[in-house]
Amino acid sequence: MTRVRMVTGGPAGAVAILLAIGAPSGATAKKAAPAPATAVLRIYLARHGQTDWNAEHRLQGANDTHLNGTGRAQAEKLAARLAGVHFDAVYSSNLARSRETAEIAHGGVPIDSLADLNERDFGKFQGFVVGSDSATTAEYERRKDAPGDDLDGGESLEQHFARVRRALEGIRRAHPTGTILIVGHGLTNQLILRDLLGLTWEKSNAISQANDELYMIEVGGGRAPRLWKWIGPENLKDL
């Protein structure tokens, strides 16, 4: 069951969409790390700023690319949004574009870079510009969401999800309560939401997050997880 409502008063005058998402019908609830029943963990989930490869619609995956000028401006905007938030910890992947975004946005908290939060290795498609060749694009679109397909020497969704879950388990053991920031990647963040919200592959594959969009997930407290998506005033037309 999903409920949606508008919430005001977010960081820097942003507007949030609140999605209250329960476990899928018939699903078995997963046990969180041991914590008091009233403990709540708030996870701010950002995507890294834009890179040249993002602008070119090129699959960068495990390639270690850096922010471009637009990406640095997006990271500065993220810092402004988060200016009033105290973080107990900040996590990034160990790819430069994620670390650079976290360094600009973190507000002085040391950054813990985890390889398990890295983007998926897209195998034979890494570096491919989606749409540049119709046959290759069709093959990629056909294969990318199949959970067991490693894309010819890359990484399957199942393998990627296993390491993302491993990262989250460690993070939640270290922080059963409090407020943390994770700066990840487009697909990595899909899988973080899949794990925290108990989503199916179909539902998690449908999630999109632009380079300048921010989620906040609240887990614990003896209730179903809740998800907010902050959208800056200039993006309200997209609602």
Could you tell me what each predicted segment is?
Residues 138-159:
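Short glycine/proline- and acidic residue-enriched helix-loop micro-motifs
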Residues 11-22:
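Bacterial N-terminal signal peptides
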Residues 41-53:
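Mature N-terminal segment immediately following signal peptide/propeptide cleavage
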Residues 50-102, 152-165:
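Loop-to-helix element that buttresses phosphate recognition and phosphoryl-transfer chemistry
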Residues 1-10:
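N-terminal export leaders
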Residues 84-85, 171-178:
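Glycine-rich phosphate-binding loop signature in dinucleotide/nucleotide-binding domains
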Residues 37-40, 76-141, 207-209:
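Phosphate-coordination/substrate-recognition cap region in phosphate-metabolizing enzymes
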Residues 27-41, 120-131, 178, 194-239:
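Acidic, low-complexity terminal tails and accessory targeting/binding regions
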